[in-house]
């Protein structure tokens, strides 16, 4: 039996025929969890045919027994509306009798495919990996239709999940509460985060008192989901209190320049390093060299970066959103968007080392 995997992920196809994941979310490692049960995997996703688009060679999505159903490549709601008719036509013509369908949601593609399958009376499963109610919360996204997207996305996800024949959630409880399946439907919680044993520390991380501490945060700056502004404001508050820290931020995006300006306005430019996108090896090196990991997101599913930091033995501070409370002790949690609470938590942690 074959599987059709429908996802919002964006892919790039080279003239060689090889397909790569833009953000590294869909690679050979992911396919193995399906190929052990299915003969072949068909990936239905947006695909850009381009030889010049910069891509990490390690993000190879092509694999034996994996094929791709190319959907029109679009970015944002306006381009989506322009391509919606074409998307509907391709999806309708690509439905294959006898296949198992998994729709990764939230996302327009997963929702669109699920609607087609329902009309054709074809059962489907869902992988619930995020929460539009949090994604479009105040401060997370700057868009004139943010409120509309928030309510519409939440409605669509509830509708798609409740009609599913099976569901996998990346959280233990959070997403299940807001987006439940029908009582008779099988559901399970599982994470696709894989930690290589070679990356695990040989000994526990020991936090020593020092003149300046190294803080690390990871996340795209394309949107304000990861709250870089909150981290910068907390860093400035700590500096005023005589608690000196240096922040390294891994991740690129359109808000990087604005965050650099904010750091300058807060007089902490020399204390912040926006390194942009880096290799897997560089991420591991930063984790090894850091004293404290921060993930103060405004929205989350089950955060891969936080799990990796915890696996490295790093003390971590997070927010009370998504799956973060399922990973961290209550002592290490703050309200989303609260820079004062973050500064207080960091100061307490660094001046009471035994909490780590």
Where do the language-model regions lie?
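Conserved acidic donor-binding segment of nucleotide-sugar-dependent glycosyltransferases
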Residues: 331-340, 348-353
């Amino acid at each position: 039996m074959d599987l059709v995997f429908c996802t919002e992920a964006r892919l790039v196809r080279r003239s060689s025929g090889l397909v790569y994941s833009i953000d590294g979310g869909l690679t050979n490692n992911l396919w193995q969890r399906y190929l052990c049960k299915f003969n072949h995997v068909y990936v239905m996703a947006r695909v850009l045919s381009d030889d010049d688009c910069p891509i990490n060679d390690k993000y190879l999505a092509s694999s034996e027994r994996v094929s791709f159903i190319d959907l029109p490549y679009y970015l944002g709601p306006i381009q989506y509306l322009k391509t919606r008719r074409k998307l509907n036509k391709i999806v309708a013509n690509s439905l294959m009798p006898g296949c198992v369908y998994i729709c990764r949601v939230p996302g327009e593609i997963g929702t669109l495919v699920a609607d087609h399958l329902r009309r054709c009376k074809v059962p489907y499963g869902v992988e619930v990996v995020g929460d539009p109610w949090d994604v479009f919360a105040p401060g997370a996204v700057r868009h004139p239709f943010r409120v509309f997207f928030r309510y519409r996305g939440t409605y669509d996800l509830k509708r798609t999940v409740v009609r599913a024949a099976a569901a996998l959630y990346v959280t233990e409880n959070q997403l299940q509460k807001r987006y439940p399946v029908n009582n008779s439907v099988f559901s399970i919680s599982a994470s696709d985060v894989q930690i290589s044993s070679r990356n695990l520390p040989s000994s526990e991380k020991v936090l020593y008192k020092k003149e300046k501490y190294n803080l690390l945060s990871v996340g795209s700056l394309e949107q304000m989901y990861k709250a870089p502004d909150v981290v910068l404001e907390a860093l400035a508050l700590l500096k005023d209190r005589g608690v000196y820290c240096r922040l390294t931020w891994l991740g690129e995006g359109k808000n990087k320049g604005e965050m650099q300006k904010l750091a300058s306005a807060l007089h902490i430019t020399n204390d912040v390093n926006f390194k942009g996108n880096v290799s897997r090896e560089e991420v591991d090196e930063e984790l090894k060299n850091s004293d404290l990991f921060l993930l103060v997101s405004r929205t989350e599913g089950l955060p891969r970066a936080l799990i990796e930091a915890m696996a490295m033995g790093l003390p971590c501070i997070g927010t009370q959103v998504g799956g973060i409370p399922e990973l961290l002790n209550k002592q290490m949690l703050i309200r989303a968007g609260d820079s004062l609470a973050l500064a207080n938590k960091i100061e307490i942690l660094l001046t009471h080392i035994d909490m780590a």
